[in-house]
């Protein structure tokens, strides 16, 4: 999430000139044992029924195959005689069968495969340990004592480690903030991830038919997608898209857009690049709600190769199963809870509302309520639905049954927006520490890399050797707007980490014990 609600810190120096820092606990995610809106359950079942034809035809085909395998020569002879004297019936049945098969072929969802993905690993000289971060913040001369103390407290409670990265421009005193520096950061991240992706997959850039790039806060002209087209000399008829201003959940949105394009354009590849740009979006003011992103956001990016080619199934890592998107932008509080604006001195930054955690919780609740019917075992769905009905009949006196999502997924990639979000999701979804390990360790090692964080988490699970054939992964991301988006993947094989994984040189050190 765009800045995850850690503790809210505030307060100014006392009359004696000393720095005072107050910590006010913000409202955490709402308890999911509270009310669940039935209309979102209905929406989930609508998505399920949309694939009902496929669900019905498969068991029917199995039954017919079993019956046919049990027929002996006498049965076949009797069937042939019956067919000779019922020609009209046979023609009608054949027409119905052909029609049914045609409808199935035309309406069945075509598979979208994830061939491979790559996450950018910045060079060591871009690391920003706590001490260096605080020293550079002090030397800029832009922050007063209260703001510096506030940032120190946030860092200590953030869940970030000492090895996260900030862009090159921020390592100078004063920082070298310019359009050229921002372009350089974008190029290093995007091209670094793409170079590794093309090397690992042996796919030629000319074979890419669809390109989707998402970056929330940096949208130059020409666009980031145009920079990639120029760098790799992609073909002239490529369908390229550049998503801006959509926050930390834009990675899943980009995957959803690429999926829709792959369903229309056959036999092609799609590349999804997710990143964020820090160079021109560092806040040099003293407003507390706008300082939190400085402490959490770090350099990172990912590149994902998707395919709709049937022959790619054998070498692909995952198959895309579902994407569920929730947008609460119609609500004014949700719309403004993560908001880019200027402070009283005219300095631009991203402001985080005190209601952020509560809004994130409501948006998440809507998202998982819609997702449930698509992924949960029938036993969980029955319990979930029945308790909702009973609750409706008895005016809210009965708490809804919260499904066990661990029965639907083996792995969870929760956006590493901040420690508080991960803690609350672990509690409310009743997850074990191992289920949120990838999120915690990604936050510790790389910080909040915005929309690409869910890919660093998936890379962590692979590096640990935990991904098995048939395992399902739930990627869940939050972002400004306010949005909550989920992507569900199924592993097609026992997945090994790709070459030059971002965890390659440090996976043996993890998990680490965190103390706040």
From Swiss-Prot:
Pathway: Lipid metabolism; fatty acid biosynthesis. It is a multi-pass membrane protein. Coiled coil: none annotated. Expressed at low levels in siliques, flowers, leaves and stems. One of its GO terms (molecular function) is fatty acid elongase activity. It holds the Pfam family ACP_syn_III_C. It is found in: Membrane. InterPro entries: 3-ktacl-CoA_syn (IPR012392), ACP_syn_III_C (IPR013747), FAE1_typ3_polyketide_synth (IPR013601), Thiolase-like (IPR016039). Belongs to the thiolase-like superfamily. Chalcone/stilbene synthases family. This is 3-ketoacyl-CoA synthase 4. The gene is KCS4.
């Amino acid at each position: 999430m765009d800045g995850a609600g850690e503790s809210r810190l505030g307060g100014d120096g006392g009359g004696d000139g000393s720095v005072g820092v107050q910590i006010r606990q913000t409202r955490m995610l709402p308890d999911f044992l509270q009310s669940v809106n039935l209309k979102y359950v209905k929406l989930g079942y609508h998505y399920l029924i949309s694939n009902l034809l496929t669900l019905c035809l498969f068991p029917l085909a199995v039954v017919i195959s079993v019956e046919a395998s049990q027929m002996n020569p006498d049965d076949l002879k009797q069937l042939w005689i019956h067919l000779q004297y019922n020609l009209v019936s046979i023609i009608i049945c054949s027409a119905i069968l052909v029609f049914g098969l045609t409808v199935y072929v035309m309406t069945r969802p075509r598979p979208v495969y994830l061939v491979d993905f790559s996450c950018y690993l910045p060079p060591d000289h871009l690391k920003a340990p706590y001490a260096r971060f605080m020293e550079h913040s002090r030397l800029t001369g832009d922050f007063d004592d209260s703001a510096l103390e506030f940032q120190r407290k946030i860092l200590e409670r953030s869940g970030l480690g000492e090895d996260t990265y900030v862009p090159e421009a921020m390592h100078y005193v004063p920082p070298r903030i310019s359009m050229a520096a921002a372009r350089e950061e974008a190029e290093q991240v995007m091209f670094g991830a793409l170079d590794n992706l093309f090397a690992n997959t042996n796919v030629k850039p000319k074979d890419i038919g669809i390109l989707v790039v998402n970056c929330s806060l940096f949208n130059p002209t020409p666009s980031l997608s145009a920079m990639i087209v120029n760098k790799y000399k992609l073909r002239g008829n490529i369908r390229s898209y550049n998503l801006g201003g959509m926050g930390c959940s834009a990675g899943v949105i980009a995957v959803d857009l690429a999926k829709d394009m792959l369903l229309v354009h056959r036999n092609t590849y799609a590349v999804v690049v997710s990143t964020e740009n820090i160079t021109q979006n560092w806040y040099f003011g003293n407003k507390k709600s706008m300082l939190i992103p400085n402490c959490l956001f770090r350099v990172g990016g990912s590149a994902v190769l998707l395919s709709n080619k049937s022959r790619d199934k054998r070498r692909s890592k995952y198959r895309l199963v579902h994407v569920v998107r929730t947008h609460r932008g119609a609500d004014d509080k949700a719309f403004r809870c993560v908001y880019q604006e200027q402070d009283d001195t005219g300095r631009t930054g991203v402001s985080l509302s005190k209601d952020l955690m509560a809004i994130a919780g409501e948006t998440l609740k809507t998202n998982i309520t819609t997702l449930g019917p698509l992924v949960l075992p029938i036993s969980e769905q029955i319990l979930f639905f029945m308790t909702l009905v009973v609750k409706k009949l008895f005016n809210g006196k009965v708490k809804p049954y919260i499904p066990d999502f661990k029965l639907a997924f083996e792995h969870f990639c929760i956006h590493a927006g901040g420690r508080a979000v991960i803690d609350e999701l672990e509690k409310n979804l009743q997850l074990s520490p191992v289920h949120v390990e990838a999120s915690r360790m990604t936050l510790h090692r790389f910080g909040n890399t915005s929309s690409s964080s869910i890919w660093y988490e998936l890379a962590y699970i692979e590096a640990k050797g935990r991904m098995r054939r048939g395992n399902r992964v739930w990627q869940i991301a939050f972002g400004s707007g306010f949005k909550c988006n989920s992507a569900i993947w199924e592993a097609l094989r026992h997945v090994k980490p790709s070459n030059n994984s971002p965890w390659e040189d440090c996976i043996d050190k993890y998990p680490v014990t965190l103390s706040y």
